[in-house]
Amino acid sequence: MSFERIQFFLETNPEYGWMLVFLFGFLESMVITGSFMPSAILFSLCIYLYNIELLSLPWICSIALLGSHTGDVCGFLVGKSIGPSLLKTKFIKKRQKAINKTQKFLDRFGPYTVLFGRFIPAVRPLVPFLLGITDLRLKRFYVADVIACSAWALALALLVVSVAVSYTH
């Protein structure tokens, strides 16, 4: 899907702008779709919506936060549900040493991993899934993820405004 198509869709259906922000925030955070979906799509969409004044910056960032947080929680729950059976596969058992190392790291730094992982696009969708496989409780993950997504939304706001200002000058 090209950005031009999204732009055309929004020009003819502006009432769906907020849904697209939520959808792309969600999709880039999910373990499967987020692995191949570039963050630039959501970023470009947010800049576009801000520039044409379809949504205010607080709305854009709040909706993106909700979408990304929802995607993270879903990824965590997927990890909780299929993680134990995934760890029993031959593929994973052959890499048990690396898995144990990763598990120890995540057990020790789990909530901090959520925060740092949120700012690294390549690992963003994997962190919630991997933490779901560990013994981290949902409540602890949830709190860490709300903090991480809030910090990310603030960074998104700063980037949107800085890029949008450069387009107007």
What are these regions (language model features)?
Residues 24, 67, 147-148, 152:
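Transmembrane alpha-helical core residues of multi-pass small-molecule transporters
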Residues 1-21, 52-129, 133-142, 158-167:
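Membrane-interfacial helix-loop-helix
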Residues 34-48, 126-134:
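Re-entrant/interfacial helical elements at transmembrane boundaries that shape
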Residues 31-32, 43, 75, 121, ...:
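Hydrophobic side chains within alpha-helical segments
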Residues 44-54, 152:
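Small-residue-rich segments of transmembrane alpha-helices in multi-pass membrane proteins
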Residues 39, 145-146:
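Central hydrophobic cores of alpha-helical transmembrane segments
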